[in-house]
Amino acid sequence: MNLESTATSAEYWSDLADALNTPMMKQFLAIKKDFPDTILFFRMGDFYEMFLEDAKIASSILDIALTKRQNAVPMCGIPYHSKDNYISRLLNAGKKIAICEQSKPEEAGSKLMTRDVVRIITPGTVIEENLLSGFQNNYLAVLHLKKSLIYFAIADFSTGEVFYSSVSVTGLERLIAELEKFKPSEICVPKSEHTFFQELEYFKNREFTVLKNQIETSEKDSFQVLSKYLNEYIRETYRDNKLVLREPKILSSGKFLEMDRETIRNLELVENEKEKNNTLYSIFNFCNTAKGKRLLKQRILFPECDPVVLYSRWEKQDILLKTVLAPYITALKDFGDLERILTRFRGNHAYPRDFRSLLNSISSGIKLKEELEKVSYPFLIPIEELKKISDFIQERLHPGDDLPVILGNGIFLKKGFSQKLDQAREAGVKGKDWILDLETKEKKRTGLNTLKIRYNKIVGYFIEISRAQAEQAPKDYLKKQTLVGSERFTMPKLEEIERTILEADEIIQEIERTEFNRMVEEVLKFSSSLLSFSEEIGDLDFQISLLTAKDKFGWIRPKLSEDRSLDLNDSRHPVVEATLPPGQEFIPNSVYLDTQDKAIAVLTGPNMAGKSTFMRQIALNQILFQIGAFVPAKSAKLPIVDKLFTRIGAGDNLTAGESTFFVEMKETANILNHYTEDSLILFDEVGRGTSTYDGMSIAWSILEYLSSLSVRPKTIFATHYHELTELSRLGGIFNLYLETLEKEDRVLFLRKVKVGKAKKSFGIYVAKIAGVPEPIVKRAAELLTDLESKKKEIKIQEAQPTLFTEPETKNFNSQTEESILKLKLEEMTPIEALKTLEDFQKKLRKQK
């Protein structure tokens, strides 16, 4: 009978009541009521058991058997030693896990163990090494509403990093952009603000962690409020351990190049829709340390706007360019993840091997310091403090790389460190030798060839004899346990040896645990120095990664433009070029933009000619420049850009009821409402999601508006509306096109950008090579010829009226003309201009 069918029976409810009335289940329920939103891992011996609704949820996610305790209580369980794999799967499903451990009997003679929740693991609070994704950051966000501002904190508990910032309630795009960069695996909001955030469009399908305790502070303490919420959540999830976060970094507006979420996605900086390969990050990540890899990703997502920072990075690169990098790279490979090691030390999750990793890191760091001093590289590590830590650890740590994963499962402290420890180890070794010797003697004395002496944690040491020979056991054997195929015994001599071994083990465990804790405390005294060391290592690794990319791909050092112009000579797309098949070369292109006469390039050319690639490579070269990297070009002179916008491609947001065109217009509006004179804007096919004339009118209006500005943002405007090329007569606008070559019935896309405008779109040819059936392609060609012929006839008729026809008069009424003349275009936003244009259009249609 399954669970559903029994749930309606009186017998089931009676059995359930009885089952829940046991001391153990009463204990479970008492603990569970304090952690209702978690799956409770209830330790019972060598297993974590889950009961009731927790069991149903966990068994479904983990694909493990759901059974019933006393025929009523749903339950499932996992071995304690393999919990990480199961916890990881639950976290990926968005669940929280409360780890409830057993310690000692509740009272003398009681079978019920004392149990307490020692840790709550949530998606954003993971610090356990086996649950983290390699070197990747694991962020948690806290949002806090205060009047008209949203304050937010982004923290990685595994590294201790914290970032603070704030945005206006009306400027949510920046908040969304920051969340897109950090991609927090958990977002926390105060209980009183939950409804506000839940109703925002971006968060509609997002689960929040609701912070129950409301923190009251003054108006000026908003960042302090975030700090208190973070610390409160640490106490709640880590249960009174020493985990602390570092000093926060402020993400102030203007310090870094701003990119909205569409730009981050369109440029595929650190991931694309399908994978994390073939991105800007993946192709020039040559870092050898975890810190270096994280730092490279951060700097790609937060390019600098301060030229002083860029010059500092270039100076370091210039020093390294004069040296051989191979020895530095070899040394960097020995570095452990110091940030996470320190976090594990604070969070009571340290491993013995962490000390070996720390020791190797310090040793390599000291060697690097000596080598880099020879070339005057500013490698500012606290050398004296590091030597103190190294000496302290070396005095104690067992040499070699065979340290145990878990304390107690092998040798941790070196021989000679403690006389008492050495004696206990010797006694333990002798005791085990005595066991082997006793087994040999007992086999010979009894003549029982199935006799073996074994050990487990529950029974201890025992003599095991098969059931067939058990009756022949000597009288001095004391029966200990009966199994299906064997009997287990003990004897006075074995018990004596066992006491010796167990006493020795207790001494070893006590000394090693005490010294382990002391070593952790000593290392934490130098945590500030170690974090500074980690930062220097990460920055060196970052610089060497940039130099490696330069050598591998043939990139060059860009120059800073003093006049705000952008000048790329034979630039290339870094990702496309790096992923081309062997023997295939990327065709380079040049571009020049300024803020006056050459500010706005109208880019035309057929589909597949390379318009989007060209625009993306400009953006990626700009980003590489502003992180201090080399760029793929023959030469480059680039400005500091404060905001980078891309409107490339659009997909329906059907879940929000938004069409392709609406999404396109929202993105366009965001750009036109937030650009500055120092922005770089890349528009691709604006207006294609609606009718031809509507779309062209909008695109035309945008270009006119940008042209009318006294200082124009640098803009590339790719379009299929060839009529827009006529706007080159306006100030600041010029034409570019992708060159093609017609050869018999073929079209060659030459991928070369030239000054001027494209002659054809070649859409029918693209349809043909895409596999559209031949009859359809043929008919399309006929229709195109017909339409183009009519278009020419209309133009001729408009240009040369006959003697027998009167010229057509434009029936604008005086009121409309007067309204147009009164418009103050310089005071109108682009959206207001579009709305006014739409109103005039409606009036003219009514006149017709």
From Swiss-Prot:
SUPFAM superfamilies reported for this sequence: DNA repair protein MutS, domain I, DNA repair protein MutS, domain II, DNA repair protein MutS, domain III, P-loop containing nucleoside triphosphate hydrolases
Coiled-coil positions: none
Residues that bind ATP: G605, P606, N607, M608, A609, G610, K611, S612
GO MF, any single term: ATP binding
Gene3D superfamilies per record: 1.10.1420.10, DNA repair protein MutS, domain I, MutS, connector domain, P-loop containing nucleotide triphosphate hydrolases
Pfam families: MutS_I, MutS_II, MutS_III, MutS_IV, MutS_V
Keywords for the protein's UniProt record, in alphabetical order: ATP-binding, DNA damage, DNA repair, DNA-binding, Nucleotide-binding
Family named by the database record: Belongs to the DNA mismatch repair MutS family.
Function in brief: This protein is involved in the repair of mismatches in DNA. It is possible that it carries out the mismatch recognition step. This protein has a weak ATPase activity.
Protein name: DNA mismatch repair protein MutS
Source organism (scientific name): Leptospira interrogans serogroup Icterohaemorrhagiae serovar copenhageni (strain Fiocruz L1-130)
Encoding gene (name): mutS
